[in-house]
Regions:
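Short, low-complexity disordered leader/linker segments with a strong preference
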Residues: 1-33
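Exported/periplasmic ABC-transporter solute-binding proteins
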Residues: 23-290
């Protein structure tokens, strides 16, 4: 009887040691992994950073998932990612919720971007003011003949509501940066799941207009020059104009971490802000941080 008890105790002790060893391996593995979630605008850039970083840091894993800035923020708040990549600032309500969950969001500007407004290559429009853009996307202007004399009902393309690009465009174009304004996208606007989907539709549809980060610009479509008003010069998005805050629809691209970055997350963030990391920004057609 005592021998059976002794054998059972030995077996139990062995099992506990194996479990502890497994937990230790998981813990070690976790320290070698960084989970990034969020902005569709930033996903290709972050994947390029991750690939470059892992070449010089063997044994590490940087996992990048899109889904929109809102998805990244939700994941950061619920502690299911290490970094939320976003193309807009976190809202006060989101920061408050994060703090309730014991998460202190720390803002890290990692690149700059200009929102390009694009139309089909066959469209004769060359430039628009911010006010004209607002009238187009709120539905006040419905036909291209009101702008260029060419008949054609405007097809509005927008990102989905959980997209930071959607939120930024609404706040800074439709609402002209006025926090008290209530202007919304026209209910006729087609909400597409990615910037690439907007690019593809604009390329095919002669009456379409859409917006996306400048990293998605392609020769297959026309980028409209944007002016602050009808008395101001119009500009297309360009690196030097965005760094000098001259292009009217410029924004920072941000990575939020849980408190100050630490461990592998800190090492990865330091790489991003290094000359090597900022060269990746340039190669991906975004704008390096000055």
């Amino acid at each position: 009887m005592s021998n059976r008890i002794l054998r059972s105790c030995v077996a139990l002790a062995t099992l506990l040691l194996l479990l502890a060893s497994g937990c230790s391996r998981k813990s070690d593995s976790a320290r070698n992994t960084v989970q990034i979630k969020g902005s569709d605008t930033m996903v290709n850039l972050s994947q390029a950073w991750a690939e470059q970083f892992m070449k010089t840091h063997p044994g590490t894993s940087i996992a990048v998932t899109g889904g929109g800035s809102g998805n990244g923020i939700t994941s950061l708040i619920s502690s299911t990612c290490d970094i939320a990549e976003v193309s807009r600032e976190m809202k006060e309500s989101e920061i408050a919720l994060a703090r309730q969950k014991g998460v202190e969001p720390t803002k890290n500007i990692v690149a700059l971007d200009g929102l390009a407004v694009a139309i089909n290559a066959a469209n004769p429009v060359n430039q628009l003011t911010i006010a004209q853009l607002a009238d187009i996307f709120t539905g006040k202007v419905k036909n291209w003949k009101e702008l260029c004399g060419r008949e054609g009902r405007i097809v509005l393309l927008s990102r989905e509501v959980n997209s930071g690009t959607h939120v930024y465009f609404k706040e800074h174009v439709l609402r002209h940066g006025n926090a008290e304004a209530k202007d919304e996208f026209s209910p006729e606007a087609l909400l597409l799941p990615s910037s690439q989907a907007i690019v593809d539709e604009v390329t095919q549809n002669t009456d379409a207009i859409g917006y996306f980060g400048m990293g998605y610009i392609t020769p297959r479509l026309k980028v409209v020059k944007i002016a602050v008003d009808d008395k101001s010069p119009a500009y297309a998005p360009a690196i030097e104009l965005i760094q000098k805050n001259i292009y009217p629809i410029s924004r920072p691209l941000i990575m939020y971490t849980k408190g100050a970055p630490a461990g592998l997350t800190k090492t990865f963030m330091e790489f991003i802000r290094s000359p090597e990391g900022q060269e990746v920004v340039r190669k991906m057609d975004f704008v390096p941080v000055p």
